[in-house]
């Protein structure tokens, strides 16, 4: 009676408690949040093409950046978006690191966090430092 079972790695991963996503929902009553969400989707469409955005959003969901409600609303908004082909960046339909960072900034802003010019400068400085370190390390 009252046996304790120890879970191995796979079982604990499967039964892992759901952690809240960075963005759980986009409030319907907040027009600024809706505008930001639409501008973010427009950005993603222009960077990767409309046909690839649902895969990108699914990727963010798998990372824990988006919750169920936020993902559902973004996909609903996406159905009504048309982007002029002349604004779409030619490429593989995938995003680069900078694009993912910008997406994360949109998510933080949708959560009500202010993104100051100082914060953006600090992020840019950190990225330059990392890039310089990688160039020195890998001899690029």
Curated annotation (Swiss-Prot):
The keyword Mitochondrion does not apply. The lineage of its organism: Archaea, Methanobacteriati, Methanobacteriota, Methanomada group, Methanococci. This is Putative flagella-related protein E. It comes from the Archaea. One of its GO terms (cellular component) is archaeal-type flagellum. Pfam families: Arch_fla_DE. One of its GO terms (biological process) is archaeal or bacterial-type flagellum-dependent cell motility. To M.voltae FlaE, also to FlaD. The keyword Lyase does not apply. Keywords: Archaeal flagellum. Transmembrane segments: none annotated.
